[in-house]
Structure formats: C-alpha cells, structure tokens
Regions:
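Extended ligand-binding clefts on enzyme/binding-domain cores
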Residues: 1-168
Length: 171
C-alpha cells in the first residue's frame, strides 16, 4: 500500500507489501488473489464469456493446495505466509477473520463457476467451521465484543480485539 502517512516505515509515496515494521510480507494478499481469480471465473461464466484455461488452472490449483493444507493443519485455513523458504502455516490462537472469509468466498465462487477441484467442498466446510467457531457470542448483555469475529475477545478487560473489515470481508 502507499505509505502516505507512515513515514517511519519507509519513504512516502513508495509501495510495500510488508507489514508495518516487521520486514515480513502481509499475509492477506494470498486469499485476496484466490478470491479475485475465482470471482473472475464466476463473472465470466455468468456473462457467457470464455474462461481462460490459465484462470481455471490457477483457481483449481489454489483450491487443491488449500484442501491439502486444511487437512494437514487439523481443519484450519492458512493464516500466515512467511518469507520463503518457510512454508505457509496456521498459527494457533491467531484467527484472521478476513483471510478465512476470503478463502470461503473464493471457494464459493469457484463452486458457482463450475470448478470440480478435488477438495473444494472441504475447503468451504473448513472455512465455514472456523468462522462459526470464532464468532463471539457472550453471556454479557451489551458487551461490545458480542457478535464479532475475534482471536482475542478479552471479555473481562473490555480491551478485546476486533476489526470492522473482518466482518465486511466475511460477509
């Protein structure tokens, strides 16, 4: 993103893929690329336009990789993409709602487009299960964390972590 207001992380008007200050690429790009490609496929089908074989392959390969990852990680979608050679991983206790929602959206668009990728249903089911598990329903009436997705709701301290864009991208 353009660093117009974050001068301490780099010169203004330059592009970076890195998280602020940690020298590590932001992991949110991967699910966005998957979802966008799957949606492009779906939109082409809906308009009766030809779908490039490269696009189908891209989406199906992502889907099959995701299915394998979800199985290997005990039913979780990836939430961290470190710098190579370290492989993508699922970091326990670091649910990343917007990434999970985008994996689900991508798999859903792929299904609607007609993908027959091995494991497609499993990817959708895994992402949906994570979203259900991480949805916060408290026993405290009016608590601000009630009805959000959060890896750290902190019900006792009132300092829970929730990001509005999680909800937007999940929906």
């Amino acid at each position: 993103w353009n660093r117009w207001d974050t001068h301490k992380y780099g010169p203004p008007d330059t592009w970076t893929t890195f998280h602020w200050g940690d020298g590590k690429p932001w992991s949110g790009y991967q699910p966005r690329a998957y979802m966008a490609a799957a949606r492009a496929w779906y939109e082409l089908v809906m308009r009766g336009k030809p779908v490039p074989e490269q696009l189908r392959l891209y989406v199906d390969r992502w889907t099959e990789w995701l299915a394998g990852f979800c199985r290997r990680s005990g039913g979780h979608t990836p939430n961290d993409f470190p710098v190579a050679p370290k492989p993508p991983e699922w970091v326990p206790d670091d649910f990343t709602g917007h990434m999970c929602g985008l994996w689900l959206a991508g798999a859903s668009y792929a299904s609607l487009a007609g993908s027959t990728a091995v494991g497609l249903d499993y990817v959708r089911e895994t992402a949906m299960a994570e979203l259900v598990t991480e949805f916060q329903v408290t026993d405290i009436p009016g608590h601000p964390m009630n009805g959000c997705w959060s890896p750290d709701p902190d019900l006792s301290g009132g300092n829970g972590m929730a990001f509005g864009f999680y909800t937007g991208e999940i929906f």
